[in-house]
Each structure stands twice: as structure tokens, then as C-alpha cells.
């Protein structure tokens, strides 16, 4: 296969993948979250555990996308009462207000990296706040919360977040 044909093939494959993601907008949150996680330098050895708090349907979506992307993250649905009893390197909130998120984060024994899909202002609570912006998923970063998580995130992710704010 010539280099030109190979580039066309890759472009078509990319377009196909993008069309599938746009056809399934509910999968954008997990895909965006897992992509952000791939740019994190962790203080702990693999595998990294992502806990989806009080939302088993969203947890199933994360598991599906995790398998599609062939990621090695351990995805688990956890209830609030279990949160301090299980190992969570990252926590995804989808059913709490920013104030409730902050209260939960303040009471955690560890300092996981936190994500939310219900916190568009991103001034309180989670470090990464994902939201649907027309046909795509965007995110904001709460630097104060990110610094509490004690993980290092590639600065290019932070720049991307800044440029996607509405």
C-alpha cells in the first residue's frame, strides 16, 4: 500500500470513529474522561481505579468505552457509603451539586482526581468538569481542586481546557 493510500485509509478510519462518537453522544463523557486520565502521571502503580459514584448506568457506559479503547482502567460503580472503603484513584460525580461534591471530597481519606458532569461553573468541587457543548464534550479545570489530588496532569490538557471554555 502506498503512503498516499495509507493516509487516505487512516483519514477514513478516523472519520468513521468520529461519526460513531457523534452518533452516541452519551459515550462522549466516558471517552473524554478516559482520555484525560491517560495524560495523568500517577503516584501509584497500575492499574488505576476509576469509581463512578451512585450511577450504575453511567458506570456501564464507562466500562463499554474502556473496553473499546482497550484501556487498562478498573471501572467500578460505588455508592457514597462505600467510597472510603474502596480504592479509587479517580472519582466521577454525576448526581451531586458542586457543594455536595466539595463536601464529599473534603471527607475522603485519600485525595483522588475528581470529575463531574453536573458542575458547569467548576469553581467548587471536582477538578475536571465535563459538559456537553452543542455536539461535543468540553471541560473546565478547577486548579484548586486539581492541586489537592496530588497527581500531575500534562499541561497541554490544562491548555486545552482553557481554550474550550464557553
Where are these regions (language model features)?
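Bacterial N-terminal signal peptides
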Residues: 9-19
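Short hydrophobic alpha-helices and adjacent helix-cap/hinge residues
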Residues: 2-5, 22-166
